[in-house]
Amino acid sequence: LRASWGLSGNNNIGNYEHTATMSQGGYVYGNTVETAYWQGTFKDAAIGWEKTSQYNVGFDLGLFNGRVNLIGNYYNSLSYDLLYDQPISSISGSSSVKTNLKNAKVRNSGVDFQIDGRILTGDFKWNVSANISVNRNKVVDLGGINDLYLVSERNVVSHVTRSGLPIGSFYGYIADGIISEKDYTNIMIDKSNLVNGKFPDGYQLIGPAVPNYNNIHPGDVKWRDVDKNGLITENDREILGNAYPDFTYGISTDFSYKNFDLRATFTGSQGAEVINFQKYYLYNMEGSGNQLASRSE
């Protein structure tokens, strides 16, 4: 049996990150070019390491004179004083300053299991090993900061970091199919009932909700109206998943007979989700570029 605890720091902040610098330039004052100085970079003088406190408990078990070995481990780590590029007003001359998010915490916890076996019979030797790992990532607190958004392709928000969820969860609208000719007819009926961009109280949509009633066509994506207000807005974005797998695993084996040997290793992960941006470009129906033929279906 074994147990351990440790405190480590992430110092990936570069040298002199706490030191602001001055910039120099010239300006014309009367008939003379004068030299001027201003603060060129903004720094947090109190910036420090991002810290991670972690404990582990586990066991190592050997059976049958060491021919079968079992290894198990449980870990729980808490990272705090997270490093973050805090946005600041652009009138300051900079767009962000690297700092520690006070009271912000991220937890990683999980288990690892491994089993090893050996067969030794004369000139024949065979070793096989299998392992499985499960990790859970969770933002415990953002230290009073609102949701952190990541903007990706076409300046679209695609990820969000939010308390209670894994870091960088996928975030966006839910597609419910394609707008048909019948949908379009009903949408135009709904459009005729709009008053100053809103529907009268109690009005029931005939067609699907759309983001812009003045720019909609058959074949456009039909988005889910999550808040049921009859319009597709930013409030209809939902958590779509995350890139963390349910578990990862691996198997390795090697055997030998006299002067012949063979080795093989297999690794994999299960349950991870991805954003297919290649599919986005081939199905987005924007501009005059080529699209996959199946898009017409």
Region locations from a protein language model:
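C-terminal beta-signal and adjacent terminal beta-strands/loops
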Residues: 79, 136-138, 216, 256-297
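Conserved small-residue
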Residues: 120-241, 281-285, 290-295
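Extracellular/lumenal carbohydrate-interaction signature centered on repeated Trp-anchored short motifs
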Residues: 244-245
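Extracellular/periplasmic, surface-exposed regions of secreted and cell-surface proteins
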Residues: 1-165
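Short helix/loop capping segments that flank catalytic or ligand/cofactor-binding pockets
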Residues: 12-13, 171, 182-183, 263-265, ...
